[in-house]
Swiss-Prot record:
PANTHER family: GMP SYNTHASE [GLUTAMINE-HYDROLYZING], GMP SYNTHASE-RELATED. GO terms for cellular component: cytosol. ATP binds at S228, G229, G230, V231, D232, S233, T234. It is an enzyme of class 6 (ligase). It comes from the Bacteria. SUPFAM superfamilies: Adenine nucleotide alpha hydrolases-like (SSF52402), Class I glutamine amidotransferase-like (SSF52317), GMP synthetase C-terminal dimerisation domain (SSF54810). The gene is guaA. This is GMP synthase [glutamine-hydrolyzing]. Keywords: ATP-binding, Glutamine amidotransferase, GMP biosynthesis, Ligase, Nucleotide-binding, Purine biosynthesis. Residues 201-388 form the GMPS ATP-PPase domain.
Length: 513
């Protein structure tokens, strides 16, 4: 399989570069900016892309690529900081710009006969997305300018003349961002026409490769998978099942913190998928251990430890554990930015493999979320399952703020069911990335039936996003919100006030806890 390496210098858009490449049918991987030529050779890519980054190539904190990558004979495209790293390496000059460029900008491509560029073939003068405070002020020897903007005379450069064979290109703007109107076409020109890559990455080719790999790794051993009914674990389980059939044993843990009637619904929709699933009813155990606990971090840790205990009871002869790890999780562990500050503990079965001496099978670790759904469709999984909104591992324990008890969980389940039901009936469910209700640890005064009430406050949350890394609050119609609020207050005993969360991520997170 032909591939492209993206070297990460810390740009917020690095994952977007990799995704745009895959949309062209080409497999891409993200590695740290410091990756050595030897490691690059092991990956055997057909091209390299240098991402943007937040530092300056001339500063004390400059992060620069290994100089040996420019001698590998591979086509290289530098984006924003990547362009500046190229100019710096080949003897050009990069300086702070007196006039920064952030947002949309118009670029002009040099179309004179002696400047005709393969990179800009079929690319009209158009708006692109800029995000830089530095710019190239002196062209390195053996390079030429192919495009300019109002603030950057050297908005695009490429090797030519004696260096033409190097096939090194640089762009000051971000072709991977949707605001760069013809950016994807430009990436296609680089990868297909200049690097000569033949697209061979697809959901089907991925599935075929994974099935072969899973069979080889698992052999005749049995495999266990914790399945939640979410997109990732369901697709992972079905993919492994396609490879090894009845050797796979799935366990669904009902912790009493799921959506209303979730356990029954999940077991029902898993039936047609041909999976062998055991339902572990552990509602009382989880809720007992959470009694009186208000700290969200403590709740997460209790749920994580309890999940491991329950899961252990179902491990017998299994040698492998299936996990639904996705590519963003893998990227985070090797990113230029290093380990991120822990905002919340992640609830997963990460403690199981080492503790139980289980080997991992992570069939989705090369995929982004949208690719997981595409693989699910190829596997024949129903759209209702694939398009379910994300649900936190600790479940409603982090949506019932404060201490958790069965009564408060039931109130939240009933309210959330109304919210989701109305979103679906109004055709709004698929228009938002995620929607849910939060039961707040406060009460408010109200009047119902001429009587004073003092009951719970509920918050509704709906966000729009592509990957959950950033999100904007969904601008749901006011009449829709009024209908949902009215139904909840009238139909759910214990709630007399409904609020709508209009916070974006950042600065807020999507979940409240």
């Amino acid at each position: 399989m032909q591939s492209v390496l993206v070297l990460d210098f810390g740009s917020q858009y690095t994952q977007l570069i990799a995704r745009r490449i895959r949309e062209l049918g080409i497999y891409s991987e993200i590695l740290p900016y410091s990756t050595t030529p030897e490691t690059i050779r092991e990956h055997n890519p057909r091209a390299i892309i240098l991402s943007g980054g937040p530092t300056s190539v001339y500063g004390d904190s400059a992060i620069l690529p290994h100089p040996g990558i420019f001698s590998l004979g591979l086509p290289i495209l530098g984006i924003c900081y990547g362009l500046q790293a190229i100019a710096n390496h080949f003897g050009g000059a990069v300086e702070s710009s007196s006039k920064q460029e952030f947002g949309r900008a118009k670029i002009l491509v040099d179309r004179s006969a002696d400047h005709e560029s393969l990179l800009f073939e079929g690319f009209p003068d158009s708006d692109v997305w800029m995000s830089h405070g530095d710019k190239v002020t002196r062209m390195p020897e053996g390079f030429r300018v192919t495009a300019s903007s109002g603030n950057s005379e050297m908005c695009a450069i490429e090797s030519y003349g004696s260096k033409a064979a190097l096939k090194i290109y640089g762009l000051q703007f971000h072709p991977e961002v949707q605001h760069s109107l013809y950016g994807k076409q430009l990436l296609g020109n680089f990868l297909l026409n200049i690097a000569g890559i033949t697209p061979d990455w697809s959901s089907k080719s991925f599935i075929d490769h994974q099935i072969e790999d899973i069979r080889e790794r698992a052999g005749n051993n049995t495999v266990i998978c914790g399945i939640s009914g979410g997109v990732d674990s369901t697709v992972a389980a079905v993919l492994v099942s396609k490879a090894i059939g009845k050797q796979l044993h799935c366990v669904f843990v009902d912790n009493g913190l799921l959506r209303k009637n979730e356990a029954e619904k999940v077991m029902q929709f898993l039936k047609p998928l041909g999976l062998k699933v055991t339902l572990a009813d552990s509602r009382d155990l989880f809720l007992t251990r959470l009694k009186g606990v208000a700290s969200p971090e403590k709740k997460r840790k209790i749920i994580g430890r309890t999940f491991i205990r329950v899961f252990e009871e179902h491990i017998h002869e299994e040698k492998f554990l299936v996990q639904g790890t996705l590519y963003p999780d893998v990227i985070e562990s090797v990113s230029v930015k290093g380990p991120s500050e822990t905002i919340k503990s992640h609830h997963n079965v990460g403690g199981l493999p080492k503790r139980m001496k289980l080997k991992l099978i992570e069939p989705l670790r090369e995929l982004f979320k949208d690719e997981v759904r595409a693989v699910g469709r190829e596997l024949g999984i129903a759209e209702d399952i694939l398009m379910r909104h994300p649900f936190p591992g600790p479940g409603l324990a982090v949506r019932v703020l404060g201490s958790v008890n069965p009564e408060r969980v039931e109130i939240l389940q009933n309210a959330d069911e109304i919210f989701i039901e109305e979103l679906k009936s109004s055709g709004l469910y698929q228009q938002v990335w995620q929607a849910f209700s939060v039961l707040l640890p406060v009460q408010s005064v109200g009047v119902m039936g001429d009587k004073r009430t003092y009951e719970n406050v509920l918050a509704l949350r709906a966000v729009e996003s592509t990957d959950g890394m950033t999100a904007d609050w969904a601008h749901l119609p006011h009449d829709f919100l009024a209908k949902v609020s009215n139904r909840i207050i009238n139909e759910v005993r214990g709630i007399n006030r409904v609020a709508y969360d209009i916070s974006s991520k950042p600065p807020a997170t999507i979940e409240w806890e």
